[in-house]
């Protein structure tokens, strides 16, 4: 990771480019933190949320955030919502427990892939995909299989730059109840960092890694960041607060 002085310069250089961004999944745990950090760092000239419902915010910092409400079952009809964005962040996701196996596949694979296709067609140059540690299209575990399938399909779209993030267990206080994740967070949260680094990461660290990677020069058409790389890239890099 670049030192703080270099990182600050990279951020300032990025701001001068007056780029626009869209966020998918801004109502989720990672998406909420991502939006807050993007606004706090003032990285983009235009910020757009794309989702199935309009979100409400109380803070003034959110006043200029644009929102596009779409029907994910009919995304082709909402292609204009994906046009004119330089950068895209996809934090969409649900669980098999909440949506059932078919619903999970529909959201985590079909919605994500169609959104990526529309973003590519709409001119998006840099697509950032939140995936998962262990993602593998050949996995016998549905969750990891779907994540791996999406990664492969999005890579085929040939964005100018594709950044895929594979965090482990996300350490946060979810509003949505996920008992398995809760137990894992309690377990990994009690371990020394050196032990947990391969398996868990705070959400805010994931988000800061995403943004630090964003403003840094790309390392190729596709960048794959595993949990340890995310921890390294996102640590000790506090941005401005709202």
Curated annotation (Swiss-Prot):
Keywords: Acetylation, Disulfide bond, NADP, Translation regulation. GO terms for cellular component: cytoplasm; nuclear envelope. Pfam families: NAD_binding_10. InterPro entries: NAD(P)-bd_dom, NAD(P)-bd_dom_sf. SUPFAM superfamilies: NAD(P)-binding Rossmann-fold domains. GO terms for molecular function: protein serine/threonine kinase activity. The modification N-acetylalanine is found at residue 2. The active site is at 143 (proton acceptor), 147. NADPH binds at residues 27-30, 52-53, 92-93, 143, 147, 170, 178. Residues 2-25 are annotated as: Required for interaction with elongation factor EEF1A1. GO terms for biological process: angiogenesis; import into nucleus; positive regulation of programmed cell death; positive regulation of transcription by RNA polymerase II; regulation of angiogenesis. Signal peptide: none annotated. Monomer. Forms homodimers during oxidative stress. Interacts (via N-terminus) with elongation factor EEF1A1 (via middle-region); the interaction is direct and competes with EEF1A1 binding to guanyl-nucleotide exchange factor EEF1B2, thereby inhibiting GDP for GTP exchange and reactivation of EEF1A1. Interacts with nuclear transport receptors XPO4, IPO5/RANBP5, IPO7, IPO9 and KPNB1 as well as GCN1L1/GCN1 and LRPPRC probably through their HEAT repeats. Binds NCOA5/CIA. Represses translation by preventing reactivation of elongation factor eEF1A. May also inhibit nuclear import by competing with nuclear import substrates for binding to a subset of nuclear transport receptors. Has additionally been proposed to act as a redox sensor involved in cellular oxidative stress surveillance. May bind NADPH. This is Protein HTATIP2. It comes from Rattus norvegicus (Rat).
